[in-house]
UniProtKB/Swiss-Prot annotation:
Identified as a drug target. Fatty acyl-AMP loading is inhibited by thiophene (TP) compounds, which kill Mycobacterium tuberculosis. Overexpression of wild-type Pks13 results in TP resistance, and overexpression of the F79S mutant confers high resistance. Structure-guided methods identified a highly potent and very safe lead compound, TAM16, a benzofuran class inhibitor that targets the thioesterase activity. The thioesterase-like domain is inhibited by coumestan derivatives that possess excellent anti-tuberculosis activity against both the drug-susceptible and drug-resistant Mtb strains. The gene is pks13. Residues 116-541 form the Ketosynthase family 3 (KS3) domain. The presence of FadD32 is necessary for the transfer of the acyl chain from the AMP carrier onto Pks13. Residues 548-567, 1344-1368 are annotated as: Disordered. Changing residue 1644 to G: Coumestan resistant. This is Polyketide synthase Pks13. It comes from Mycobacterium tuberculosis (strain ATCC 25618 / H37Rv). Residues 713-1034 are annotated as: Acyltransferase. Keywords: Acyltransferase, Fatty acid metabolism, Lipid metabolism, Multifunctional enzyme, Phosphopantetheine, Phosphoprotein, Repeat, Transferase. Involved in the biosynthesis of mycolic acids. Forms, with FadD32, the initiation module of the mycolic condensation system. Synthesizes, in coupled reaction with FadD32, the biosynthetic precursors of mycolic acids, alpha-alkyl beta-ketoacids, via the condensation of two long chain fatty acid derivatives, a very long meromycoloyl-AMP and a shorter 2-carboxyacyl-CoA. The acyl chain of the acyl-AMP produced by FadD32 is specifically transferred onto the N-terminal ACP domain of Pks13, and then transferred onto the KS domain. One of its GO terms (molecular function) is 3-oxoacyl-[acyl-carrier-protein] synthase activity.
Length: 1733
């Protein structure tokens, strides 16, 4: 893009005396000839670029014009004067005179809405080339004049460079640029993104997430504090290059790529992750995107759409496409890769990637929130140049216009601007045009000695395109922060096309002070999009008015009293509010004028002054400083604590004050896993942080792994908390507490005439019954208000006796005045009454260790005693005559119980209070109870819960009852616990109620309640409150920990603590691009003369979906082809090219895939495809459940198994595990019947021996599930070469039905094909009717398969099958394991009747039938099963329990099962597998079938003990079997944890561990608490699980007896209780449940140790519902399965599906394929090692 230059700026034509019309005619002729049009057809008013004139034409035209006229022009004239009309005038008449002197009268003041407020920049983040990854790094680079431009990094664009022609183009292109070092890295765990999704997310989205976090952290705004707030997100982005990778092969493109590569999601993903509720917009205006985004953010703040804005831009150079395009255009990219803005040698720009983000607030809001304001945006504007001189050509008129608009918006004269951060692309066209526009607006009218300074950050970081404006803003903000303008580099001298002096511009080439022409530093920032969208932002330094609160405007003089006819008005403020926040109306003011309250008494002032003097004379001790550390995950919290401790030991950390460190930490994000270290100095802080990092307890350290889910209950205690000096220290040292003490003091003076403050300040005060109550009330109010000042609030309150008054206030039930009145009346009456007591009228109170039931029995011996307080489940406060109180105390002590007498003369809450009730009623007349605003657990109303918003309760009767009747404190606490509350905070000068709270919570089964005191006798009161609030914060309750620190006076008050560390891992899609098509599935295609088709495919990696390959190949030739059946013969080796051959036949084709390595070919896949758009429906047998056909578009019944992709069902292990070696497809000439082949297929799929299959029983009753049905369906289609079969035809039928179906299809292929074609237009109902007609009369009844029973088999009635779902308890549950399957089948075969379900009661058999069943079972189980065993078994499950012992015995030596023995002589490395929870290693048979046929496998069965104890037993046996190695250790579920533990044990002994495979051994996403409360919850879940699984009702579990038992004891206790209750669960299942429970607990409690080696985690998508039901914390999965923090080299292989599916087909095929490659590499390495020896 060229620019304009002129040797004679305003000189008219000299060589030819032409007129303007003549010049126009000449130009028309020239242009017409150049573009091939008749001159007369040329429109002089149309831009010449639209007529077809190119830049190259313009150069030639300029030379001809110079020859003709003598006027030297450059190409830029064509852009400044785009039409023939304009250009001719310019050539003949020259440029019009420009008045650079300016017009002093021009008004630049703001006009328009008052909302045009200034906007504060409070946070900044940068990610620029050259390792400018923080604002500090960026500033240092700018100040030093460094750049981040490099050659194309190794590996960049490697996906594209495999294509030779593309590689050649890249090699010859100008590819120097600004590249980020780690564009592929992303911390997916931190941002809670699964690996697969992270791989599919555009790096621009990842950058936006990280930059937002860093910007908020830089702003010291906790991201957590903005959740749900009106936070706007505006992000510029103009490319989505990553989509090229995501869809490079559309056949495997992941759905995550839809959102992952969408530009709109860049901003949306930020809003989603951070839970921002303001506008969320991605802006694309090309190179001005990020500055336009900032402008829109400013507007959103001004118009109220947002209260905080995150704005900026991102850019990533993922593909070479744009770079190649610009390079081939020419004159765009700089040959040396450096941008030379406004320089004489400017020759183009350099592409760069990166991003920057700003955090914006309204200035007033930033000042209110105590934010550090970095700079201020005074104004901004955007525009477009409209239909100018070409879509992508810059336009100086439009640029000048946007400048004017921006400075008008700011209300600033542009002549006072100090510095312009220019767009400055370094092109010979763009720079002169930009300079011209600046000269017209910013330079106009300036004195020559006050030029506008000019620079461009592009010279340092390159052109970040959509993020360019963010980079420019970052530079200006940093320059303002450091009060220095950094140099613009690569400047060789002024461009010859720019008159700097005339335009009053000056380039900065050295660090320069801000000139402050207008009295303060002022800058403008420009960005221009190549599509014509222009933006300019005006930025200034922070002024005193920005950070100093404005003086309040004086209140107007009160108006005179209104005339009667006038409406009443309020003097002063427009509105007034009462203490509840309600508007006070004029009438209310008139009716109830506020009485003037007394102030602080002179005596109190004297005492206060003396106390302050005493305090000042004391030795100053360091304050207790809270250091908050948190993270989403506990492991990250620990790592952050460790890093902070290390930093605090560094010189920088030691030089930073503890308060500055705590203040900085308080403004970090507050994650769910929190800790607070309370410290007086650095040493204490470091010790505490080390304890957090190690997960250990320590003094003044509070740490929890997750938040409490319910809010705190504020406990307002009663009598007993009083002591001398209570509240005094806090009053003297905390202004908030002091202010509220004085408020209550004024009200008490008004009520009683004496000062509470005097009592608090009097060190000799001995509190009486009256003064105790009033003073505790005052302290409670002040404590609560202090907590509320720091953001704390109760979820509910509970008062105890005198505490009811403060409770009523905090619940919103009474105003402070009325609450004070209540406590004053109560206490005064009690004080007066006690003073009059003597002799026989004296009553005492005592606490005794008796429960409510016990105290009633004891009271039979003490008739005059009464209950005052039900304090705890085993503690009661009683009152009565002294002799009876002394007697009950003696009795309790004699019984070994706790007993304590109170120092009182009266007994409140007893009949002794009766004389006071009348006076109390009179005293409290006029109080106004209101509806509570938070929950109340009322100890007056027997602990009942009062909901917020309910009817008012605090009337006079409430206070009478509260004084006279018993206090139900423990009832209220128990109700709170039962309502889910676990945190109890006592507001008192000394904790007196927490002990009773603890006793009650423990009795309720809550053994880890959070019991938090406020003040305590003989403890520093300020430190106590800091500790209280730290605990509230740690438990996740409302508490703004920032408020625990004084307001910062400047940056020096914040420590430069370590930032959040992202743990980035590579997330990248393995796309490949190739011109020969071989990397695009199915590969390069060749049609052969014999009608066959061949494809050659070069897969991008070893993980090839062979079914997808076949489908892709078939679709080339048969667009409607559907994969009918397939068989995988082998696993392709690494580096193999796949050759697919297709041979057509009527109705479809056969397809084979061979793996080719060099000239060697191996058949790996054999498949059959059919010509079908949807499945053909084969007829089912009459007498079977009708198979409902599902045509295209027809709805599928809910119970129909989902037919996902063929890819999952075609990777079938039938041929590799069960089918005889070398078996081919069925043929009628083979001599094998359809029934024989069908028996093999179904038996192998369902785990039955073919001879055990009862043919008359519906398959679903035999235990058929969706996966089995799909496997049978596909195998039948493949073996019998049939069109697709309906799944319901398999699922709902018995074997006779399926056999008849196959026979019919084999004999009537043409008819079936026609039926399929016809059904494409039919509904499901029509298909069903046609099917019935087709089969009418053609199929006979089913026949018995076995005559052993000696009776005829019954025929199904009315063609109906039994309901397979069996809703009744214990009814129609199908077989679940091998033992139950063989037992079920044997019973059905011998008796000729289906048992129905394993729990169904069996009919009585005769001895002959029982003997036949016993004989058959003995043969199958290879163990003695007797007829007595059969006759005494009530159901199949019970009989199967006896069979199971022998059936599973197998080849077991001790705890080692031989699954496949290795040959005696050598052989391959064996695979050692470990049992899953509650199961045996037989489950690994599907995996064995997926590994090479000569791979030995040994299973390690269950032993008792913890994970570590089991490994200690396994490791010696492993060494005995395998010596020094190499070892391959594999396990599913618990087996994975055992494999891992054995790997550690072997490595410690120096053994060679080559492979550790964890098959979905995924740890819980949250730490599982090991508490007594968790025991109760765990067994509740177990009961629900058992009832669901075994269809039984579990009796009530005696939790209280479980708490003292270990896991083994608990499970035995519970299972014994279940058995004794009459629930019939056989012993085998009981033992299975015992081992399952203990095994799962072993996983939960395992102490995972670090492993320095490679571990492969085969990870499913989720746990199955039963696992989550038993332990809900397994519902959450970390992206690394919870192993990342322990394993140095973790490989995660996603396998999909649920946990329970991971060990079976089809998912195990994926595991086997990957593991086979690993085993092959191990064998290759062994061979290599042997060769070297």
């Amino acid at each position: 893009m060229a620019d304009v230059a002129e040797s004679q700026e305003n000189a008219p034509a000299e060589r030819a005396e032409l007129t303007v019309p003549e010049m126009r005619q000449w130009l028309r002729n020239w242009v017409g000839k150049a573009v091939g049009k008749a001159p007369d057809s040329i429109d002089e008013s149309v831009p010449m670029v639209e007529l077809g004139l190119s830049s190259r034409d313009a150069v030639a035209m300029a030379a001809d014009i110079e020859d003709l006229t003598g006027v030297t022009l450059s190409v830029a004239v064509a852009f400044a004067h785009p039409t023939i009309e304009s250009l001719a005038t310019r050539i003949i008449e020259g440029e019009p005179e420009t008045d650079l002197a300016g017009d002093d009268a021009e008004d630049w003041s703001r006009t328009g809405p008052a909302e045009r407020v200034d906007i504060a920049i409070v946070g900044l983040s940068t990610r620029f080339p050259g390792e400018m990854n923080t604002p500090e790094q960026t500033w240092q680079a700018l100040l030093e004049g460094r750049d981040g431009i490099t050659d194309l990094p190794d590996g960049r664009w490697s996906e594209f460079l495999e294509e030779p022609r593309l590689a050649a183009r890249v090699a010859g292109a100008r590819t120097r640029g600004g590249y980020l070092k780690d564009i592929k890295g992303f911390d997916s765990e931190f941002f809670a993104v699964a690996k697969t999704e992270a791989d599919n997310i555009d790096p621009q989205q990842r950058m936006a997430l990280e930059l937002t976090w860093e910007a908020l952290e830089h702003a010291r705004i906790p991201a957590s504090s903005l959740r749900g707030q009106a936070v706007g997100v505006y992000i510029g982005s103009s490319t989505n290059d990553y989509s090229f990778l995501a869809v490079s092969d559309p056949t495997v493109a992941h759905p995550y790529a839809i959102t992952g590569t969408s530009s709109s999601i860049i901003a949306n993903r930020v809003s989603y992750f951070y839970d921002f509720h303001g506008p969320s917009v991605t802006i694309d205006t090309a190179c001005s995107s990020s500055l336009v985004a900032i402008h829109q953010g400013v507007q959103a703040l001004r118009n109220g759409e947002a209260d905080v804005v995150v704005a900026g831009g991102v850019n990533a150079l993922i593909t070479p496409m744009v770079t190649l395009g610009f390079d081939e255009i020419g004159a765009v990219l700089a040959p040396d890769g450096r941008i030379k803005s406004f320089s004489a040698d400017a020759d183009g720009y350099t592409r760069s990637e990166g991003g920057g983000m700003l955090v914006l607030k309204r200035v007033d809001d930033a000042r209110r929130d105590g934010d550090a304001i970095l700079a201020v945006i005074a104004g901004s504007a955007v525009n477009h140049d409209g239909r100018s001189n070409g879509l992508i050509a810059p336009n100086q008129d439009a640029q000048a216009d946007v400048l004017r608009r921006a400075y008008k918006d700011a209300g600033i004269d542009p002549r006072t601007v100090d510095y312009i951060e220019a767009h400055g692309t370094g092109t010979i066209l763009g720079d002169p045009i930009e300079a011209e526009a600046l000269g017209r607006v910013v330079g106009r009218g300036r004195p020559a000695d006050r030029p506008a300074l000019l620079g461009a950050v592009k010279t340092n970081v390159g052109h970040l395109e959509s993020a360019a404006g963010a980079a420019s803003m970052a530079k200006v903000v940093l320059a303002l922060q450091h009060d220095k303008l950094p140099p613009s580099i690569n400047f060789a001298g002024p461009s010859p096309y720019i008159d700097f002096d005339a335009m009053r511009l000056k380039m900065i080439t050295t660090p320069t002070d801000w000139p402050r022409y207008g009295g303060y530093a002022l800058a403008g920032v420009s960005s221009f999009g190549f599509g014509g969208a222009n933006a300019h932002v005006v930025v200034r330094e922070v002024l005193p008015r920005d950070v100093v609160e404005k003086e309040p405007e004086p209140e107007p003089e009160p108006k005179a009293a209104a005339e009667p006819a006038e409406a009443p008005t309020l003097a002063g403020h427009a509105l007034r509010f009462d203490e509840f926040g309600n508007i006070i109306t004029d009438s209310a003011v008139a009716e109830e004028p506020e009485p003037e309250l007394p102030g602080v008494t002179e005596e109190a002032l004297r005492l206060k002054e003396a106390a302050l003097e005493e305090l000042a004379a004391q030795e100053v001790t360091a304050p207790l400083v809270p250091l908050a550390v948190s993270a989403f995950l506990t492991s990250r919290k620990k790592a952050a604590a460790a890093e902070l401790a290390d930093w605090m030991q560094s010189p920088e950390g030691q030089a930073s004050s503890l308060e500055s460190i705590g203040r900085s930490l308080s403004r970090r994000n507050h994650g769910r896993s929190r800790a607070v270290v309370l410290a007086h100095d650095h040493d204490e802080a470091i010790k505490g942080l080390r304890a957090v990092a190690a997960g250990k307890q320590a003094p003044n350290v509070f740490s929890v792994d997750g938040p409490v889910t319910t809010g705190p209950v504020w406990v307002l205690a009663g009598f007993g908390a009083q002591h001398r000096k209570m509240g005094k220290s806090l009053y003297l040292r905390n202004e908030v507490f002091a202010a509220w003490i004085e408020k209550v003091d004024a009200l008490v003076q008004d009520e009683l005439g004496y000062s509470v403050l005097e009592l608090i300040l009097d060190d000799a005060q001995d509190y009486g019954i009256e003064t105790t109550q009033v003073t505790i009330f005052a302290i409670q109010i002040a404590l609560g208000e202090l907590l509320r000042h720091h953001g704390a609030k109760p979820a509910a309150v509970i008062g105890q006796s005198l505490g009811e008054a403060a409770s009523a206030y905090f619940a919103g039930g009474l105003s402070l005045r009325d609450a004070t009145r209540a406590i004053c009346s109560r206490s005064h009456l009690m004080g007066e009454g006690e003073a009059m007591l003597f002799g026989e009228y004296i009553r005492l109170m005592a606490l005794v260790e008796y429960s409510a039931d016990e105290i009633r029995e004891v009271f039979s011996d003490f008739p005059d005693l009464e209950v005052c307080v039900y304090a705890a489940p085993t503690q009661t406060v009683i009152g009565g005559p002294p002799e009876q109180v002394d007697a009950i105390l003696a009795r309790a002590e004699a019984e070994g119980k706790f007993a304590r007498k109170f120092a009182t003369k009266g007994a409140s809450h007893t009949s002794q209070m009766d004389p006071l009730l009348g006076e109390l009623t009179a005293e409290l007349q006029g109080i106004k109870p209101t509806s509570p605003t938070c929950g109340i657990f009322s100890t007056v109303h027997e602990g009942r819960y009062i909901k917020p918003g309910g009817e008012p309760i605090h009337d006079v009767e409430y206070w009478k009852k509260g004084l006279r009747h018993s206090v139900y404190f423990t009832h209220g606490i128990r109700n709170a616990v039962d309502s889910g509350h676990t945190t109890f905070l006592e507001l008192a000068p000394n904790p007196v109620a927490l002990m009773q709270v603890a006793l009650t919570t423990a009795d309720a089964g809550l053994h880890d309640a959070q019991l938090i005191p406020t003040l305590a006798r003989k403890q520093d009161e300020v430190s106590s409150m800091v500790s209280t609030m730290a605990q509230l914060y740690v438990y996740g309750h409302d508490l703004d920990i920032r408020t625990l620190f004084s307001r910062a006076s400047g940056p020096q008050d914040y420590a430069n603590i370590p930032p959040t560390r992202f743990k980035r891992k590579e997330h990248w899609l393995p796309a490949h691009f190739s011109g020969d098509g071989s990397t695009y599935m199915p590969g390069t295609h060749v049609a052969l003369p014999d009608g066959r088709h061949v494809w050659e495919y070069a897969p991008r990696d070893g993980n090839v979906d062979l079914a997808a390959l076949v489908r892709a190949a078939a679709a080339h030739v048969l667009p409607d082809a559907q994969l009918t059946a397939a068989e995988q013969r082998a696993v392709p080796g690494d580096g193999a090219r796949l050759v697919t051959t297709m041979t057509r036949h009527p109705g479809g084709a056969s397809v084979q895939v061979h793996a080719r390595i060099d000239e060697s070919f191996t058949l790996v896949y054999d498949a059959l495809v059919s010509r079908a758009g949807s499945e053909s429906v084969l007829p089912t047998a009459v007498g079977a459940a009708t198979a409902i056909a599902v045509a295209d578009g027809a709805p599928v019944a809910p119970e129909t198994p989902a037919e996902d992709a063929d890819a999952e069902t075609l990777s079938d292990s039938l041929t590799t595990r069960y089918m005889p070696s070398g078996m081919t497809r069925w043929s009628p000439d083979s001599g094998e019947t359809i029934a024989e082949r069908l028996g093999l297929i179904v038996g192998s799929a369902m785990g039955y021996e073919p001879e055990d299959l009862p043919w008359e029983v519906p398959l679903i009753e035999l235990g058929l599930d969706s996966l089995m049905a799909v496997r049978i369906k596909n195998r039948v289609e493949y073996d019998f070469d049939l069109p697709p079969i309906q799944l319901t035809a398999v699922r709902d039928a018995n074997l006779y039905n399926v056999e008849k179906l196959i026979e019919y299809a084999v004999e009537h292929r043409d008819e079936v094909q026609q039926l399929h074609e016809h059904q494409k237009t039919q509904t499901a109902e029509e298909i069903a009717r046609a099917q019935a007609e087709l089969l009418h009369g053609k199929v006979g009844k089913t026949e018995p398969v076995d005559s052993e029973a000696g009776v005829a088999l019954p025929s199904p009635q009315n063609g109906e099958q039994p309901n397979p779902t069996g809703p009744a308890l214990n009814v129609d549950v199908p077989p679940r394991d091998a033992a139950e399957r063989v037992t079920f089948a044997t019973w059905a075969i011998v008796t000729g009747k289906s048992p129905g379900g394993i729990f169904n009661e069996l009919p009585r058999l005769d001895d002959e039938a029982a003997a036949k069943i016993a004989q058959r079972l003995s043969e199958r189980a290879e163990g003695p099963i007797t007829a007595e065993d059969v006759l005494t078994s009530s159901n199949i499950e019970a009989l199967a329990d006896k069979v199971r012992t022998y059936l599973e015995a197998g080849q077991i030596d001790g705890f080692v099962r031989t699954l496949r023995a290795r040959p005696e002589a050598g052989g391959k490395v064996p695979v050692f597998v470990f049992h899953p929870a509650g199961g045996s290693t037989v489950v690994y048979e599907p995996l064995l079938g997926r590994l090479p046929a000569d791979t030995p496998m040994y299973g390690f069965e269950r032993v008792e003990g913890s994970i570590e104890e089991r490994a200690q037993q396994y490791v010696p046996k492993l060494i005995e079997m395998q010596g020094d190695g190499p070892y391959v250790l594999v396990g599913w579920s618990l087996g994975g944890v055992l494999a891992y533990a054995c790997a550690i044990g072997l490595r410690r002994l120096g053994k060679d561990v080559r492979f550790v495979g964890l098959i979905d051994a995924v740890r819980a996403g949250e730490e599982i608490p090991q508490t007594k409360e968790e025991i109760r919850k765990r067994w509740d879940r177990y009961a629900a699980f058992a009832e669901k699984t075994f269809n039984v009702t579990i009796p009530a579990i005696p939790y209280e007896q479980l708490e003292e038992l270990d896991d083994e004891g608990q499970v035995r206790f519970v299972l014994d209780a279940v058995s004794q209750s009459g629930v019939q669960i056989p012993a085998g299942i009981i033992e299975h449940q015992r081992t399952s429970y203990l095994d799962n607990r072993a996983i939960d409690t395992a102490q995972i140790q670090p492993y320095d080696g490679h571990v492969t985690l085969y990870m499913a998508d989720r746990y199955h519902d039963d696992a989550i039901m038993f332990e809900p914390r397994y519902a959450v999965r970390q992206p690394d399965g919870g192993w990342g923090e322990y394993v140095s080299d973790l490989e995660v292989v996603p396998i999909g599906g649920e946990h329970i599916q991971a060990i079976d087909e089809p998912i195990i095929a994926k595991v086997g394929e990957h593991m086979s490659r690993a085993l092959g590499q191990i064998e290759a390495d062994r061979t290599s090692e042997v060769g070297k020896q």
